[in-house]
Every structure is written in structure tokens, then in C-alpha cells.
Amino acid sequence: MNTARPPGPRGHWLLGNVVEYDKDRIAFLRRHHREYGDVFSFDDRTVFTIDPQLTHQVLTATNHDYVTELGPFAGSSALHAAGEMISPWMRARRVVRPALADAAASGMDARIVAILDAVLDRTAGRDVDVLPVMLDFAGHAVAELCLGEDAAGIPELLAANHAALLPFEDADYQLPAWVPSPRNRRFVRVHRRTMETLTRLVAARRAEPARRPPRDLLDVLLGAHPAMTDKSVTTTLWSILVGGHGIPAAALTSIVRELAIRPRLAADLADEAGPPAGAAPSAGAAPSAGAAPSAEAAPPAEAAPHGRLPLAEAVVKEILRLSPPAWMMTRVARTAVTLGEWRLRPGDEVLCTAFLIHRDPRWWSQPDEFDPARWETARPAPGTYLPFGAGSRYCLGAAVAMRQLTLATSRIAQRFHVHAPNAVAAEPEFCGRLAPAGLRAEFRFGE
């Protein structure tokens, strides 16, 4: 076993590799992957891995040998605090898993379609920035899943949190939390307001008589035996809300880009969904901006996509392969551990680069080609397909996200022609959640 650090670029004597990495992140990773192999160092505490087996090892050892990313204000005690959170978080996952499975098994199909219709009806016929529109949809969908009739205002808080986090996602150095920079103050202010709102909602629901069956995930969490603390319930809600907001929105933005580039694919998806009933709504009938979508906005059930949608599902799987929103997953070593032939120290970061694994010709035929048909036979080996991670921290809402993305893909193709003149030029942006940068589109009602 080698006790030295993995090899890697030395970089600038003062700034290391930060400047070169920020110029073109994926080009930096590709170049040094070719030069140093599947494991290489970025600096003396950070290692990249593009090896599927080692990546699978790291992800499946999370909670034991590793913890998940520590966040923008991680201090000296953050590693210990993250370890302390493992047990309550894993218990919360066990509590909500059955409810999420029910939601994925078409339990929310009608509402997902109704929410998407309401959001897109507000913007139809106008040139719009696609990512904020998809964030609006995903925010309403996950807020309703978690909080049901108490979801009012939550999508707006999720949008504010997303905006407050963006500066951190594009930065390689973070000022300590106590430094009163505008970026820090904004993040702390928005996050505090969100957590205070969730805390009030949890306390108010706790004071109500228990509902059977539970209406939403908050009811499920409050009905756990033994009882969860309000703090644990609030933290769990927050984690699910954030995970169900940014990732589906980024994936849908990539899907919209493909629908604009590939009209034949869009037509095939529309055929699979079947014709929508009724005419396109008039401008006056659309919900006002910012209004929560209502159940009355839903079309007749038979008009919406439903049941198995194999082509739409294959398109989603292929988008998640080519453009995984969680394109890089960070784990932090809890103790001294080994990564292949290398030894890591407590606090060392391992960056698992799903994007490059998904496009590696060793694991995928024609890896850079968009080919939904590959999913008719594809059976990815462990560690080679990681849109939702792996191991004990595999995305809790993966099945819900797949159903939501499949329905949304089908519904957009069924109702709209997507016109996006900059679709080809809107390349993925490798910071935070991977999505086409600056994609603009017009959703035109189909004829």
C-alpha cells in the first residue's frame, strides 16, 4: 500500500490549481485524468476519483468511513457534527421511505401534471429563462409532497435559498461564516427565515390531531414511533425540500434543451403520451404569477400522461447519464481510510466525478451520444451510473424524481412545441447542479 498522496498537477506556487480549474472545470478534469489516471490529487486535502469501483466504495462506505459534503460554512467541528447527525438522519429516511414509494407509484401523478400545467400556462408563448421556470415547478411539487395544504410560500423560500447558494457553488474559497460579507449575510438571512418558517409549520401541525392516513410527509414524520423531535422533523423536511428542488429542475432544463434540438424525439414522446383533451387555455385563464397551482387547473385525468411511459423514462435516464445534475459528489473522510492504494486522513475530501464516469468508453458504448434506446438493454455495473448516488445515502427521493421527470417530459412534449434558438449553444455549466447555461425557450401550444 502506498502511504503517499495520489499524484496530481502541482499548479501555481501560491494559488495551486484553483485558477486553472476555474477556467474550464471539465477540461481540467479530463486533462489530468488522462495524465494521472483514475485517482489524482487537486491539493494536499482533495482527491478526485473517476474509477467506478473506488467511487462505489466511497459512496457505500458513507456514514461509516465518510460523511457527505459539509456545506459552505464548515468549521473545525463540522466533521464531528456531521457524524453526530448520521443516526437521526438515517432513522428519518426509514420513516419516510414507504410514503415516498407510494408517491412514486403514481400516487401524485395527477398533481404533478396539474402543477406543471399551471407553471407552464403562465409562461406559454413567451421567451423565458428555462431554469427558473423548472425551479418554480419543482419547488411547488416538492413543497406539496412535503407539506400538502401548508405549502404556501415554501416554493418562494426555496427559490430564495437557491439564489443565495449560487455564489458559493461557483467559488473555491469560502470566507468564514463570521465574516459579514454581503454573500454570507444574505445566505444566513435567507436560511434562517426558511428554517424559522419550517419550525413554525412543524409546531403548528404537531398541535393538531393526528391524521390517518397521513396527508403528506410532514404527517408521516410526526406520526413516527418513537416520536421524532421537532428539530429532527424540521431538518429532514429541509433536506428533502432542497434535494427535490434543484436536481429535478436542472434535469428538466437539460430535457427541454433536447426536446428543442430533436423535434422527431418530441413528436415520438407526444405520440406515446396521446393527445391532450381540450383546447389550450386562454391567457386570462392562466393562474397569476406566484400563485399556488390549484387542483382545478388539472385537465381531465384521461388527457394527462399516465401509466408506463417507456420512451419518456428512457429519455430521462439518458439525460441523467449525459448531464447528471449531481455531476460531482463530495465525501469527507471521517477517519484514516484507504482509497485503492492511497491513504486518506480525517477531513480529506474525495470528489467522485459522475459526469466523467458516465462518459467513459470503458463503461459505455458511444458515451457522448444521446441514445435513449440504449436503455432497452443497458444494465450498468455498480459505480458506472450514479445520477442519484449509491449506498446508504442513495437519494431518498430517487423514485419520486424519476416519476416526476418522466411525467414532465411526456407532458411537455404532449402539450407544447419547444422553440429555443440558443439550445445548441447552451452548453452545460459545471458548477452546483449541472444544467445548460442561459437556456431560453418559448413553449408554444401544440396544434
Annotated model-derived regions:
Residues 245-272, 398-416:
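Cytochrome P450 catalytic-core helices
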